[in-house]
Amino acid sequence: MRIWLAPDHARLVFDLSGPAAHKVFTLDNPDRIVLDVENSTLKADLERLGLDKSPVERIRSGKNGKTLRLVLDLKHGVRPKSFDLKPNQKYGHRLVLDLYEKESLGKATKTAEPQAIAGRDIVIAIDAGHGGDDPGAIGSGRVREKDVVLAMAKELKRRLDQTPGYKGQLTRTGDYYISLRGRTTAARKHNADLFVSIHADAFKDPRARGASVWVLSSRGASSEMGRWLASKENSADLIGGVGSVSLDDKDNVLASVLLDMSMTASREDSRSIAKGIHTNIKRFARMHKSHVEQAGFVVLKSPDIPSILVETGFISNPGEAANLKTRSYQKKMADAIYKGIVQHFERKPPALTLIAQRKAKDNRSYKVVRGDTLSVIASKNGVSLASLRKVNSLKNDTIKVGQVLRIPAS
């Protein structure tokens, strides 16, 4: 029996020796949750669970015939959600009980108000793969993917937050699990301009090695477009990242065109950013392939947000696992991703962002007219004479009528 704490819920995981039917219900005054598990007995030590920061005060157990009853005495009311998990490579049958804070459910699907203010930050959603009961791949020396990628994600956020005009948003800040769709939902909630998912690869052959960068395949894009158009819930959502275009009031043809345009633009930006990151990583690390790869990963399927996935190396390879767990290598990888992101957005910033404003100022020009002098032009445009000379590669102050000068940012 284990417990994981996330910002909006606590997850209790019960390891089972086999499948078992169960039911959950709540009681009031005081707040309690009752979990009945048929044909079961309890072997876990409830006193050692570590409930201090959870909404659970204590857990009591009892038997009703062959049914095991667990009563969770709560510190405050929560909303339970339970489900079964089938065995995987690490765990056997499991029963999962998620306890959601009541106020978080109402907020979970709400998208933040679009940042329409000129000069806003470019928002990067940074997704550290796996977490909680899902450790991801486990490499030599028990290096866990979920730990390595969270460290890289935090370093990437630190770099972005230190750069004027950029803001990093982590999909998870600690060791807890978020569903695949929940990760992209979190990106949309923060009006992200880009979604970056960070992972570490694994393969049965420990000789496999190399980092890779992935974007959504065309097959994955077409299937996701159909899913969005077929879903009333999705069609009422936003497209266009921080825009506010809704599909729910459009006929099918127009909705299809709008969504296709959004996905095309998103995939073009994804490829551009992915190529830059691929180039940066291969300067210090071996790449699994010499090009950006494509697949239908669920986390890449946002129709309105450019999305990429970075496999930072094979954690199943002892040499790469040793690198991935070091702070210096994690910083190198985060720096390569950071540079690829910034390189793209400096070339193609979203509208109304601080970077777009700065680029517009950098692109100002002035056409010389009769009577102009270089010093007068500098004064008119609020820039120094030295900077005006430098940006135009002028060796002296001689200019000609009709000559077009670049005006540097003031």
PLM-predicted stretches and their roles:
Residues 40, 129-133, 165, 313-317, ...:
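Short connector loops/turns at beta-strand edges and beta->alpha or beta->beta junctions
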Residues 22, 255-354, 389-390:
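Active-site-adjacent mobile loop/cap segments within catalytic or ligand-binding domains
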Residues 7-11, 17-20, 28-32, 54-56, ...:
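Extracytoplasmic
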Residues 105-254, 263-275, 331, 369, ...:
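Catalytic-core regions of hydrolytic enzymes
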Residues 1-124, 376-379:
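Signal-peptide-cleaved, periplasmic/extracellular N-terminal interaction regions immediately downstream
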Residues 358-385, 403-404:
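Primarily a LysM-type cell-wall glycan-binding module
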